[in-house]
Swiss-Prot record:
InterPro entries: Aromatic_deC, PyrdxlP-dep_de-COase, PyrdxlP-dep_Trfase, PyrdxlP-dep_Trfase_major, PyrdxlP-dep_Trfase_small, Pyridoxal-P_BS
Pfam family, one: Pyridoxal_deC
N6-(pyridoxal phosphate)lysine modification, residue list: K303
Protein name: Aromatic-L-amino-acid decarboxylase
Subunit (UniProt): Homodimer.
Entry binding sites for pyridoxal 5'-phosphate: A148, S149, T246, N300
Keywords (A to Z) from UniProt: Acetylation, Catecholamine biosynthesis, Decarboxylase, Lyase, Pyridoxal phosphate, Repeat
Catalyzed reaction equations: L-dopa + H(+) = dopamine + CO2; 5-hydroxy-L-tryptophan + H(+) = serotonin + CO2
Species the sequence originates in: Mus musculus (Mouse)
Binding site for substrate: T82, H192
SUPFAM superfamilies named in the record: PLP-dependent transferases (SSF53383)
Ranges: Sequence repeats: 58-115, 118-178
Gene Ontology MF annotations: 5-hydroxy-L-tryptophan decarboxylase activity; aromatic-L-amino-acid decarboxylase activity; enzyme binding; L-dopa decarboxylase activity; pyridoxal phosphate binding
């Protein structure tokens, strides 16, 4: 394919994408395929000779689309949103065309410098403390990770390296292996599974702190866990607080947990993967109160801020905590500006070496929507979630399980777990809408997350009518 054909095919692909998204609600939101459906439709080996672009495009509808879960359908209410917008798609095209691997400033100065500026832009939108911003001479700063899972792992490994060095400086006879055996990290029993995975990868004992009646980690429970482990000779060093848990969008109490972490010299990492986007709205910024106690903070613009995957924003107060843990400097990566003190080499801030020009997506989206446009988008989703909450509350057969704060509603039929499992199975089998469950205090609960960029009140109303009708069917069957 030369540039001439690329111009033609590129325009055709833009038309295909626009048609796909314009007509997405006409497709079943969940695919009607069985595991292994695709292999028989594709040859066992790659073609020896080139195939035509026309044949490939035909196979998209024939082979790929039947197995796609349409995350951007206005009838997709599962998990949490995954962001999508036309400005971000255009930026991704440009990113692919430039194709730089921005592991250092010298590898592509614009890639590095735009990321630094965009992370400062976003930090200011969130009203983060100055300590988290790079500015012109700041000690902190932001970096784009691939996911919140990566950000948590990076924070844990940095905290681990830091505490090991501190302990060995005080007691040189204390070996790394001996220290590792005693290190312990903490998070709420409502935290995302990626926190547990970070502990596994980092070789760290991770303990779940019981949450309160609102599924929030509080001071008393954390203090009790810390004191118990210190008495047993263990070394607490890392706490993950969650703002907007995956199960029910609950919030750990930063104003209680933060001071304890600071008093104990424990690294506090905040995971706000979903909820963080909402903090650009003044009315939701209170949910971030206490961030000043944190050592690192992370959320995913690729969830709810119209920046397509992947784009996970992470800030640290002390960049040397990251560079001290991940600095590898072989001669083939060195460059003449790296010791100037004026530039950032992001390879020292992350697990992999290579990195894409992801900040282009942020730049396009922030400029083409503006802060006010992004705030309006968040507010619309929150309004729709409260609309759904109101519909549920009007039906005495159902109950709301947690406070609705942002774009997630947790609800269930009054009755057994089996009844609700049956309802969810009916909902997803019908393929008109898509939901996923959670379990709260041993109760099977349905989650309704407002996700799509194009979702409107009419979609929420139709979704509720569908759920209500299926609930009637399930309840009739139970009586019979």
């Amino acid at each position: 394919m030369d540039s001439r054909e690329f111009r033609r095919r590129g325009k055709e692909m833009v038309d295909y994408i626009a048609d796909y998204l314009d007509g997405i609600e006409g497709r079943p939101v969940y695919p009607d395929v069985e595991p292994g459906y695709l292999r028989p439709l594709i040859p066992a080996t790659a073609p020896q000779e080139p195939e035509t672009y026309e044949d490939i495009i035909k196979d998209i509808e024939k082979i790929i689309m039947p197995g796609v879960t349409h995350w951007h359908s206005p009838y997709f209410f599962a998990y949490f949103p995954t962001a999508s917008s036309y400005p971000a798609m255009l930026a991704d095209m440009l990113c692919g065309a430039i194709g730089c691997i921005g592991f250092s400033w010298a590898a592509s100065p614009a890639c590095t410098e735009l990321e630094t500026v965009m992370m400062d832009w976003l930090g200011k939108m969130l009203e983060l403390p100055e300590a988290f911003l790079a500015g012109r001479a700041g000690e902190g700063g932001g970096v784009i990770q691939g996911s919140a899972s990566e950000a948590t792992l990076v924070a844990l490994l940095a905290a681990r390296t830091k505490v090991i060095r501190q302990l060995q400086a005080a007691s040189p006879e204390f070996t790394q292996a001996a220290i590792m055996e005693k290190l312990v990290a903490y998070t709420s029993d409502q935290a995302h599974s990626s926190v547990e995975r970070a502990g596994l990868i980092g070789g760290i004992k991770l303990k779940a702190v019981p949450s309160d009646g609102n599924f929030s980690m509080r001071a008393s429970a954390l203090r009790e866990a810390l004191e118990r482990d210190k008495a047993a000779g263990l070394i607490p060093f890392f706490v993950v607080a969650t703002l907007g848990t995956t199960s029910c969008c609950s919030f750990d109490n930063l104003l209680e947990v933060g001071p304890i972490c600071n008093q104990e010299g424990v690294w506090l990492h905040i995971d706000a993967a979903y909820a963080g986007s909402a903090f650009i709205c003044p009315e939701f910024r209170y949910l971030l109160n206490g961030v000043e106690f944190a050592d690192s903070f992370n959320f995913n613009p690729h969830k709810w801020l119209l920046v397509n995957f992947d784009c996970s924003a992470m800030w640290v107060k002390r960049r040397t905590d990251l560079t001290g843990a991940f600095n590898m400097d072989p001669v083939y990566l060195k460059h003449s500006h790296q010791d100037s003190g004026f530039i950032t080499d992001y390879r020292h801030w992350q697990i992999p070496l290579g990195r894409r020009f992801r900040s282009l997506k942020m730049w396009f989206v922030f400029r083409m929507y503006g802060v006010k446009g992004l705030q309006a988008y968040i507010r619309k989703h929150v309004e729709l979630s409260h609309e759904f909450e109101s519909l549920v509350r009007q039906d005495p057969r159902f109950e709301i399980c947690t406070e609705v704060i942002l774009g997630l509603v947790c609800f269930r039929l009054k009755g057994s777990n089996e009844l609700n499992e049956t309802l969810l199975q009916r909902i997803n089998s019908a393929k008109k809408i898509h939901l996923v469950p959670c379990r709260l205090r041993d109760k099977f609960v349905l989650r309704f997350a407002v996700c799509a960029r194009t979702v409107e009140s009419a979609h929420v109303q139709l979704a509720w009518e569908h759920i209500s009708d299926l609930a009637s069917s399930v309840l009739r069957a139970e009586k019979e």
